[in-house]
Structures are given as C-alpha cells and as structure tokens.
C-alpha cells in the first residue's frame, strides 16, 4: 500500500511523515519513492524530481536489494508521468 493511501489519501500528511522518516534514515529509497509520489499528487513537481533523482542515484545496497529494485521501478514510472 502506498503512503498517501495508508493515511486516508492525505498526501500532505504523507509528505510530513515521510520527511520525518527520511531524517531518521536518509538512504531509504522506498520512502523517497513514496515521497516523490506524494509530491506529484500535491503538484510539487520540482521536489518530486529531486526525490526521483536521489533514488536513481542511490548506490546499490545488497541488504535491501529487493526493496531498492521496487523503489527504482516506482520512480521510473513516476518519471514518465512527469514527462
């Protein structure tokens, strides 16, 4: 389930929680992917692009490879939506 949906569809609330989460773990690529999606939902495309770029530039993490792969796939789809 995606972050905004977990919060009743409240993208602004999702942004707040995801930003706090990233302060604790700035390398969490799936949180960044979810944050990018929430930014797109609130028409904050520049900020979404920064998060997308951060996910795509993240070094491989063997410990979290499946999650990182999912995050990359998610942001690639978001990137297409941004154009």
Where do the protein language model's features map onto the residues?
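Short coil/linker segments at helix-helix boundaries
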Residues: 1-23, 50, 59-72
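Extended alpha-helical scaffolding segments
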Residues: 41-45
């Amino acid at each position: 389930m995606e972050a905004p949906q977990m919060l009743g569809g409240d993208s602004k609330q999702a942004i707040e929680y995801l930003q706090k989460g990233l302060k604790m773990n700035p390398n969490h690529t799936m949180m960044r992917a979810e944050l990018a999606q929430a930014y797109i939902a609130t028409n904050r495309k520049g900020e979404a692009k920064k998060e997308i770029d951060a996910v795509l530039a993240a070094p491989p993490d063997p410990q979290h490879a499946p999650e990182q792969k999912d995050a990359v796939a998610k942001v690639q789809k978001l990137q297409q939506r941004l154009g």
